[in-house]
Each structure stands twice: as C-alpha cells, then as structure tokens.
C-alpha cells in the first residue's frame, strides 16, 4: 500500500523545546511519530539537527529538520514507492538519502520521525499491533516478554540542583510476579519516597526533575541510597525492590587529569579530592555491598575504556553502556571486544532508524549482553518505545518515574499490551538481563 503523504511539523517536548513530529498517510489512515531529545548527549551519537538561530528557541529550533522531511525525504520516499511493511528497505533508503555516517545532512531527528511513522503504517497494513510488527522485524521468539520498569525516582547530576554528582537513582521491582504488579510496587515506593524527601529536606524537595524523580538537596550517593532504601522498607518491599544507578560520569570527568570530580557542581571544587578510576570503582563496589544495587549505567566516562574494562572484571552486576556506546554499532563492537560492559542502553534517537536500533539490540544479544530500552529526558506523548521493548524482547525499560504524563504514557502503554496479550506474555522479572533467552 503506497504512502500518499508525508508531512512533518514541529511540536514541543516535555522541556518546552521544539522537536519533530511526522505524519505518514496511507489508505489505512494517518500514522504519527514524535522524536525525543536528550539533555546529556554523547559525543558519538547521531546528529540531532537544530537550527542554531539564537533569536528563536535559544537556537534549538527544528525548522530545518522539518523542512528536510517535507521537501527532501517525503517526496523522495513517496516516489520510491517502497512497501511500508519493508522497514529495512525504507530505513536503508533514508540512510542512503542522507549519505553521512551520523545523519548530519538531513538530521537523525528528521530521519527517525519518518522511520517510526512508517513502522506504524506497516503494522496497520498487517493489521497487527506495533509491538507484533516489531517482533516480526526483529525475528524474536514467542511468548512476548514484558519488561521490568527501571524507575528514576531520585535525580542528581546535570538533571538537578544540589551537589549530588550521580544523575539517576532508580528502583527496580524485579521480584514482582507481573508487569502491573511491578508498576504498582514502584508507584507505592515513589509516593513514600516523595513524602520522606519533603519531611527531611523541606517542601521543595518534593518538586520533580525532568524525568519525574525528586531532587532533594542531597550531598552524596549514600544519602540518596539511604533515603530510597528507607522508602522501599516503609512500602514493605525490602528484598523485592532493588536499586539501579545511572552515574552519567562523563559529566564530571576531568579529561586533562583523568580524574572524576564528585563535587563538579561546585566551582570551588578541591582537586585533591578528585578520584582516579580505581578509587571510583572501589566506591561503586562498596555501595554494591551495602545496598541492593543490580545495575550501574555509565560508571565511567565515554572514552575512559581502561576504567570500564577494569570495573567489568570485578563485578557481577549489570554494567550498562550508554555514553560509551551511544547505540552505535562500531562502539558496541569495541565495548564487546574490550569486555567493557554487559548491557546496552538502547535509545532509538541516538542511531536514527528503527532497523539500526533492532540491529544494535541483536548484536548485543549475540554476545550475551542485556538490552535496556530507554526514553530521553526531553520526551513527548509518543509511546513507540513501549512497543519496541516488547517487540525486541529486551525485558527492561527505563522511562522515568511513575510521574509526569510523558513518562507514564510509556508505562501505561505496556499495561495495555499486558492486558491484550494476557497468557501470551511473560514478565521478565529477576531474569531481566537474559530476557531474550526466556
């Protein structure tokens, strides 16, 4: 069934910045996708095309990307008349049309919008839900696997004020029997955490960050972990709800001296207190002994390969590569060869097409890695990643706290999928790292 129209416009993301929305129209109707954007962006990821016109949106406009869809990609793709069900052919056409290694010419935000909208058109043409179409494209086995939600309940780093260097503290309800129960446990812990934060740090500590987590004025990781552990205990889930961290350590790496500054938000930070990677690795090991931590993302800077390999040898927890790999096949290959991590953070907008995202997941699975599908800090009401996480059978999703509609939209979509699949789906639970093998 041919595409009759492709139209892009700009809409706003959850931070009030413009982003790209794409409509693909076929005989079966309109299929729409909106592209997210990140705050801490890795330097090796696909190019998010921004206008750079400081007089509008502080330079963050996407009029050029929108124009590229409407004047270049749209007409060319319609003329090519590719079957919308043939996602890899569509995506290859988009990649070739751009012709640059990281989509700088047309913009990954323009290309991804079209890629995801086409996937929705393909699902409609097959008369199946999007997750089922993605499952076919990825060639994953059945039953479907519903993911463990990694919920970012406490923020630090560049996502929050306060002196806390680590960016995200997540709760992981992996001992729950079903996805809906996991979400309930997470929501209950979150509510308790919020009231504890207000009690200990004042009313404003209940204010939420970009991803819905609270951001009290916390000084160090132990303080954050104690607060979360207390919330888990008060909710009655000790031993059931685990903890994960996204350190986002590239944000506080001092490249010139190869050290990590845990007081990086303080302009008067004392260089004698900066840590070598061995000292930072030691801190993580101590935290893992003291708290129920099951996963650490970006423990070291994106080009500090030596540190990653060193830490990997000492740990059996999940070590998630995000800034290190930025969903880029070449970086993933290097990380696997150097034994730097054991899980991939999959962000579709870091690579720019659905086909490449599926391939990145498959490459990771092939080497025994886990895959965590992720939102970005600038999100929208688009729920495509919920269908992706079920379709590629990855068993883990990170999409913020159970707060703010752009975060809940994804979790609510998984609730709907759970209801629809009933006995045809299993919950990843404690086996989230190897969900693809379940």
Swiss-Prot record:
The active site annotation covers 211, 347
Where is it located? Answer: Cytoplasm
| UniProt keyword list | Cytoplasm, Glycolysis, Lyase, Magnesium, Metal-binding
EC numbers listed for it are 4.2.1.11
> Where along this sequence does the record place binding of substrate?
159, 168, 297, 322, 374-377, 398
Q: Which SUPFAM superfamilies match?
A: Enolase C-terminal domain-like (SSF51604), Enolase N-terminal domain-like (SSF54826)
User: So where does Mg(2+) get bound?
Assistant: 246, 297, 322
Specify the enzyme's EC class, one word. Answer: lyase
**A cellular component annotation (GO) from this entry:** phosphopyruvate hydratase complex
User: What's a single GO BP term from this record?
Assistant: glycolytic process
Catalytic activities: (2R)-2-phosphoglycerate = phosphoenolpyruvate + H2O
Any binding details for the cofactor? Mg(2+) is required for catalysis and for stabilizing the dimer.
Q: Key word Cytoplasm present in the record?
A: yes
Cofactor names from the entry are: Mg(2+)
Molecular function per GO: magnesium ion binding; phosphopyruvate hydratase activity
Q: In which pathway does it act?
A: Carbohydrate degradation; glycolysis; pyruvate from D-glyceraldehyde 3-phosphate: step 4/5
Which family, according to UniProt?
Belongs to the enolase family.
Subunit structure, briefly? Homodimer.
Q: What is this protein called?
A: Enolase
Encoding gene (name): emp-7
